[in-house]
């Protein structure tokens, strides 16, 4: 893969569906993941292993992971909150475990029901648990750019957490703009500082389009050296424990941006759009994505018949 390739990690099966009030059948989740696996994605966040009381929409994570047809070259990621979740994910043969902790103490207490210090201690237990297993670890720094309870987050706080995760032996880092509070200048600055600590291959950016800056933030991060980005088909998703955390950046809109700007990527947009157009029937409402509605710039329309008659 070329060094300038933008890698899209598809998160709709997990982050996209976790706040949906309508139950999506297990077979439909599996079918969605299997379809995504054929469209050029190399990474898919396929589900989570959290308490069904906390996230009832994803209570079938075990069945989903056991039911998918694993495509060669695709890494299937599971979000886990604790060691119990890690044990379930290992049993279900997840390829990568994604741990989550907030840069904000208040949000971490709301989301994880514990302090940041206790979360970090628990991560050490998980690192020990997976030793010897053929699984990689990633840690998401939630509210890395801003918190709906505390406001702007000190960049040094984020860098401290990145250092702490790396010292534990966690290989991957995600910076998450959990409630869409980031702006491009802020993104450029923080990404550059984090890339002084970790290689681009270990860094993922997770943006929300809550305030309309999602794709602008992607472009800022890409130009600062980041290469991997979370995105959700149709723009589905949000955090149930963060006020105002509307949808993730839309996968097809991001791929369209890449194609229009000739940024290398691996996703087949022409085949992705029909899949996105099935989402309203799946979740029972319209979805935020734009390109699935408008079509690509190359999808031209016939001119009105009268045009040919005008001199």
Predicted ranges, named:
Residues 1-311:
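Catalytic cores and adjacent flexible loops of soluble metabolic enzymes
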């Amino acid at each position: 893969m070329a060094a300038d390739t933008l890698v899209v990690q598809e998160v709709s099966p997990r982050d996209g569906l976790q706040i949906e009030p309508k139950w999506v059948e297990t077979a439909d989740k599996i079918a969605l993941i299997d379809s995504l696996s054929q469209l050029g994605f190399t990474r898919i966040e396929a589900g989570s292993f959290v308490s069904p009381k906390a996230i009832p929409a994803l209570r079938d994570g075990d069945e989903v992971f056991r039911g998918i047809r694993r495509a060669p070259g695709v890494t299937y990621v599971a979000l886990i909150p604790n060691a119990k979740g890690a044990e379930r994910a290992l049993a279900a043969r997840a390829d990568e475990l994604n741990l989550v902790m907030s840069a904000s103490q208040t949000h971490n207490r709301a989301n994880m029901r514990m302090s940041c210090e206790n979360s970090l201690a628990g991560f050490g237990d998980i690192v020990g648990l997976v030793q010897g297993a053929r699984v990689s670890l990633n840690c998401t720094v939630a509210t890395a750019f801003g918190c709906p309870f505390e406001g702007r987050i000190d960049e040094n706080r984020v860098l401290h957490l990145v250092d702490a995760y790396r010292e534990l032996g966690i290989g991957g880092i995600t910076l998450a703009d959990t409630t869409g509070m980031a702006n491009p200048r802020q993104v450029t600055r923080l990404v550059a500082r984090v890339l002084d600590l970790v290689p681009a291959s270990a860094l993922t950016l997770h943006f929300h389009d809550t305030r309309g800056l999602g794709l602008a933030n992607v472009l800022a991060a890409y130009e600062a050296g980041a290469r991997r980005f979370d995105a959700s088909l149709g723009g589905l998703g949000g955090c149930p424990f963060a006020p105002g955390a509307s949808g993730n950046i839309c996968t097809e809109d991001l791929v369209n941006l890449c194609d229009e700007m000739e940024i290398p990527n691996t996703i087949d947009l022409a085949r992705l759009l029909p899949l996105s157009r099935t989402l309203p029937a799946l979740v029972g409402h319209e979805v935020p994505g734009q390109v699935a509605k408008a079509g690509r710039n190359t999808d031209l329309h016939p001119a009105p018949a009268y045009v040919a008659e005008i001199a």
